[in-house]
Amino acid sequence: MSMQDPIADMLTRIRNGQAANKVAVTMPSSKLKVAIANVLKEEGFIEDFKIEGDTKPVLELALKYFQGKAVVESIQRISRPGLRIYKKKDELPKVMAGLGIAVISTSKGVMTDRAARQAGLGGEIICYVA
């Protein structure tokens, strides 16, 4: 059976991995997942990520903890296959009054809400991370 929403699966694996205090989680890789992982790493929500395998690439995320607690408090899918959510540059949300981030897919690539606001871009809101 095919996976309907691979991004929601990625976010769920991160959420479950941190709830179980796992060091790392693995999942099938894609360009969008790698772009999201890159944003999460730049913002300090994960330690690192790497791609392994040639024929079927696997993405491995090293999860991050601070004083025994998970760094990612909440991670929530917003735009989904059945209901895409697009926002203009003026309508981009602030997650937890600026403490969290919104991961946004723009015409210039995947970036945070702050970077999109700075670049004057809108796009599809993939998820909220806090």
Curated annotation (Swiss-Prot):
GO terms for cellular component: ribonucleoprotein complex; ribosome. GO terms for molecular function: rRNA binding; structural constituent of ribosome. The keyword rRNA-binding applies. It holds the Pfam family Ribosomal_S8. Keywords: Ribonucleoprotein, Ribosomal protein, RNA-binding, rRNA-binding. The keyword RNA-binding applies. InterPro entries: Ribosomal_uS8, Ribosomal_uS8_CS, Ribosomal_uS8_sf. One of its GO terms (biological process) is translation. Part of the 30S ribosomal subunit. Contacts proteins S5 and S12. One of the primary rRNA binding proteins, it binds directly to 16S rRNA central domain where it helps coordinate assembly of the platform of the 30S subunit. Belongs to the universal ribosomal protein uS8 family. This is Small ribosomal subunit protein uS8. It comes from Yersinia pseudotuberculosis serotype I (strain IP32953).
